[in-house]
Regions:
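Outer-membrane beta-barrel transmembrane domain signature of Gram-negative proteins
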Residues: 1, 5, 17, 29-145, ...
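Short, ordered loop/turn segments at secondary-structure junctions
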Residues: 16-20, 31-33, 151-155
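Glycine-rich, histidine-containing beta strand-loop boundary motifs that form or position
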Residues: 13-15, 77, 150
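Outer-membrane beta-barrel proteins
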Residues: 11, 21-26, 82-88, 98-99, ...
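One face of beta-strands
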Residues: 15, 164-166
Length: 174
């Protein structure tokens, strides 16, 4: 990130990216529906998540004679892109191999511990969100701190969200 001063404002801007991936390997099992030739280890698929975040924040203090401390004001904006991907496992981890049980019913398909994700389960989705916030905080008296904040966001997949916060803290030790 980068920090700088712009007039009375302490500014901060940053970009962050993160990703995680989880893949399932199933061991010491078999796909009973394949029969005796079934292997005992399967790559059963998995999923990944990634997030790219840009943000800009400004903070400043404003002296007000009616307050016991300067009023702290913070404003900011954030843009985010999130991605989720679910990927299929190898076919033997989920497929039906054709073996029938002695009672005439089909053997359950897929690895017995966890039948892998199928191609029909695959997804590769993304969404974006843009948000902004305002936070104001000050001591109303020497002992009483008040804070109020509001944050609005717009999500590409489900619309708008508005959240607020109101807090009071009394310091009994002063």
């Amino acid at each position: 990130g980068v920090s700088w001063i712009m007039g009375e404002w302490d500014m901060d801007a940053s970009i962050g990216y993160g990703k995680n991936k989880m893949a399932f390997t199933i061991e010491n099992t078999l796909n009973r529906s394949i029969g005796p030739s079934s292997k005992t280890e399967f790559e059963a698929g998995g999923f990944s998540y990634d997030q790219l975040v840009y943000n800009l924040t400004g903070v400043r203090s404003v002296d007000m004679a009616s307050m016991a401390s300067p009023v702290n004001v913070a404003v900011g904006a954030e843009a985010r892109r999130e991605g989720y991907k679910l990927f299929a496992g190898e076919p033997d981890s989920y497929r039906f191999g054709g073996v029938m049980l002695p009672n005439g019913l089909p053997a359950p398909p897929g690895a017995q511990v966890f039948p892998g994700f199928r191609p029909a389960n695959e997804s590769n989705t993304h969404r974006t969100a843009i948000g902004a916030f305002v936070d104001v905080e000050a001591n109303l008296t020497k002992e009483l701190l008040a804070s109020i904040a509001v944050r609005g966001e717009h999500y590409s997949d489900f619309g708008d969200s508005l959240a607020g916060k109101l807090a009071l803290r009394y310091d009994f030790s002063k």
